[in-house]
Regions:
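A structural signal for multi-pass alpha-helical bundles of membrane permease subunits
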Residues: 1-172
């Protein structure tokens, strides 16, 4: 698929009809003639700059709590991981319903405290925040990877750090 996509990028390839080799013309058009490319690149950079740190910090914090918990850790591990395996179509449907301006759950809850809910997905400033929150829904995969890494650390290392006088949080 990667090589096929690369091949397609050097062609004008209509849905019906013959393809025409155009060389680097598609890339020139994208970089110099299409303002939407730069806008979408900027939005993607903002998304990544906000989402990645939040995802890692939140996943690490939850993994750390589950690593030290005993009683209900299996239940919570499953509860946090389960949303990350939900189908993408189902996830989009659920979050579209939550963010809907007319009948959305979020605006319905805000109406109880007298707040007229905004258009979460229609306002460009709020849409990026709404999408980041919806994307963080699946942080369970990252959390599970970090939890597995924490479980792989031998207990002897923690014991040696404790004997050496290293405080609890600094042991990380």
């Amino acid at each position: 698929p990667l090589l096929f996509s690369l091949t397609m990028s050097f062609h004008d390839w209509p849905v019906v009809g013959e393809r025409t080799f155009v060389g680097l013309d598609n890339y020139r058009t994208m970089l110099f003639d299409d303002p939407q490319f730069w806008e979408s690149l900027w939005i993607t950079a903002k998304f990544a700059a906000i989402y990645v740190p939040f995802n890692i910090v939140m996943s690490f914090f939850i993994a750390l709590m589950l690593h030290h918990a005993n009683a209900w850790s299996g239940f919570f591990r499953t509860a946090f991981y389960l949303p990350s395996v939900i189908s993408g179509v189902a996830l989009v449907t659920i979050w579209s319903w939550i963010y809907s301006r007319e009948y959305g759950l979020l605006n319905f809850m805000l109406s109880f405290v007298g707040i007229d809910g905004p258009n979460w997905l229609g306002d460009p400033g709020l849409a990026i925040v709404a999408i980041i929150i919806a994307s963080l829904w699946g942080f369970g995969g990252t959390m599970l990877i970090l939890l597995t890494g924490l479980k792989a650390i031998p207990k002897e290392l923690y014991e040696a750090a404790t004997v050496s006088g290293v405080p609890g949080w600094a042991q990380m």
